[in-house]
Amino acid sequence: MPTKAGTKSTANKKTTKGSSKSGSARGHTGKTHAPPSMHSGMLYKDMVNIARSKGIPIYQNGTRLTKSELEKKIKRSK
């Protein structure tokens, strides 16, 4: 298989340039896979809404609670 080093390197350069360019220009459209939040049953937004309705504080010492922390608190309050 006679492959020239020159053509190979230029091809590689082209692909990397193209993908990085289109990715930065388009933002999130380049992502084909769903974000991790889409796979889980409950979204973070849902958790926050449940916590609010139950009167559970979402913020703890100045920072927002993580999804798992909110989940624990919601389960405890049931």
UniProtKB/Swiss-Prot annotation:
GO molecular function (one): DNA binding
Region (Disordered) residue spans: 1-41
Keyword Ribonucleoprotein among UniProt keywords: no
Domain of life: Viruses
Inducing factors: Expressed in the early phase of the viral replicative cycle.
Compartment(s) where it occurs, according to its Swiss-Prot or TrEMBL record: Virion
DNA-binding listed as a keyword: yes
Any one GO CC term of the record: virion component
Family: Belongs to the asfivirus P10 family.
Name by which UniProt lists this protein: Structural DNA-binding protein p10
Organism: African swine fever virus (isolate Warthog/Namibia/Wart80/1980) (ASFV)
